A protein has these predicted regions:
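Structural/interface elements that position substrates and couple domains in central-metabolism enzymes
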Residues: 1-256
């Protein structure tokens, strides 16, 4: 049985996807009203295909609770807010969730961190939190990082079709987790180290941010010099190795 911790924009679709594809799932969230809404048969946000996925998961037996479950696999999908003053990701919710897992988990349980974190976050914050209570990583508990790669508005489709990265200390554990994601993911799933998985997510987002910034900077220059940026981009994109984005409002979304 998989206990998905955090039933927000990533955790809920992930839980529903696994449940509707044959995995026994219990979703956990501290928000009592959210859990009550889900148990009443209603979704908590709108997303293309989510209602149909929810119905399929309910028929398959998914359950929702405010309690952490005693099991051997957890998926942590809680917020990692950005501190605008320190310009760092706050991992406190991830650490708190892992600490709660350790109170109930079976020996050898797998804890998958899906939350977006910066490179080194698991080493700096999650591992010490586990070791502080006397758990031995690799024996009492196994750590895995499987960063999500979805975008709001197309989440259900991308959960199925996007490629995935799974980072693990032990490749055997990584392959075991891969089997769960393979239940619904039709994309390629690559198993690597935890730090590499952390880095790939940040690099992917940075690549997008840089390209968005480039298009917007180009628009600013063209506006200053009274040139048509859209015509220039169209001509430049005729080159087989050039693909400039269209100018827009800038970067956005939780991950970027």
């Amino acid at each position: 049985m998989v206990n998905v911790i955090g039933l927000g924009y990533i955790g809920l679709p992930t839980a529903l996807m696994m449940a509707s594809h044959g995995v026994e799932v219990i979703g956990t969230d501290y928000n009592k009203e959210l859990v009550a809404t889900l148990n009443a048969g209603k979704t908590t946000f709108k997303e293309d295909g989510l209602d149909e996925l929810f119905d399929a998961a309910v028929k398959a037996g998914i359950k929702f609770s405010t309690e952490y479950q005693r099991t051997d696999m957890y998926i942590v999908s809680v917020p990692t807010p950005y501190d605008k003053f320190s310009k760092k990701v706050d991992a406190c919710y991830v650490v708190a969730a892992v600490k709660e897992v350790m109170k109930v988990c079976r020996k050898g349980a797998i804890v998958v961190i899906e939350s977006t974190v910066s490179p080194g976050t698991i080493d700096r914050f999650v591992r010490p939190a586990i070791e502080e209570v006397g758990f031995v990583i690799g024996e009492d508990i196994n750590l895995v990082h499987a960063p999500e790669r979805t975008t709001p508005g197309n989440m259900v489709y991308e959960l199925i079709h996007n490629n995935r990265t799974i980072g693990a200390d032990d490749r055997v554990i990584g392959e075991r987790v891969k089997e769960y994601y393979t239940s619904f993911c039709q994309g390629e799933i690559v198993v690597t180290s935890i730090r590499s998985a952390e880095m790939t997510k940040v690099v992917e987002n940075t690549f997008r941010a840089v390209n968005i910034a480039f298009a917007n900077e180009l628009a600013r220059i063209c506006r200053h010099d009274n040139m048509d940026v859209y015509e220039i981009i169209k001509i430049c994109n005729m080159h087989p190795r050039v693909n400039i984005l269209q100018p827009g409002p800038g970067v956005g979304g939780h991950c970027i």
